Amino acid sequence: MLFRSLEIPEKRRSHIITKDLFLFACYTGTAYADAVSITRKNLFRDDEGSLWLKYRRKKTDYLGRVKLLPEALALIGKYCDDTRTTLFPPQDYHTLRANMKSLRLMAGLSQDLVYHMGRHSFASLVTLEEGVPIETISKMLGHSNIKTTQIYARVTPKRLFEDMDRFVEATRDLKLIL
């Protein structure tokens, strides 16, 4: 079962918020401390009208910038509330961790599920696997050092095969002299 399609009863609002925060991390690469403190002031439009998230990381104070995917925009829209300064409802980390454990069981996942996996998923599956250069991913994640990004962004088998196919195609007519 895909985590994003997990049905959660309305009476479990706290679990719904946790699921949405985790999905937001998958679509933006934000850490928990950053996601729960993002406000409308962190959103801006580029010259083409696309909405971006621009924020200073709580952990490092480095700038993170990421263009918001439609899925992330939908999550922001779901929680639009003029009375709250943050984009998402507040949720303390202990509640989030407990809810992540419950959601893992509800989804039938055997592996532990922690919020930070969303950040790793963004780096590996959403960006690197789709051909975004690791240098760009590093800027999106707000890293000061590409070595840190390499911990997050793992090359998947799919990406490896696609890169090798491109390499073989590019070198097809190349005559190597050994």
At which residue positions do the language-model features occur?
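Short basic/aromatic active-site micro-motif
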Residues: 16-21, 93-94, 110-130
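C-terminal secondary-structure termini that scaffold catalytic or DNA-interacting sites
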Residues: 166-178
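Conserved tyrosine-mediated DNA breakage-rejoining catalytic core shared by Y-recombinases
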Residues: 3-5, 28, 37-75
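C-terminal catalytic core of tyrosine-transesterase DNA break-rejoin enzymes
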Residues: 23, 27, 119-144, 151
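Short, cationic motifs built from Arg/Lys/His that form the positively charged side of catalytic pockets
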Residues: 17, 30-31, 59, 64, ...
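Basic, Lys/Arg- and aromatic-enriched nucleic-acid-binding interface segment
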Residues: 3-32, 36, 130
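Catalytic-site neighborhood detector that most strongly recognizes the C-terminal catalytic loop/helix
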Residues: 57-61, 141-166
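Active-site/catalytic core of tyrosine-dependent DNA strand-transfer enzymes
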Residues: 69-110
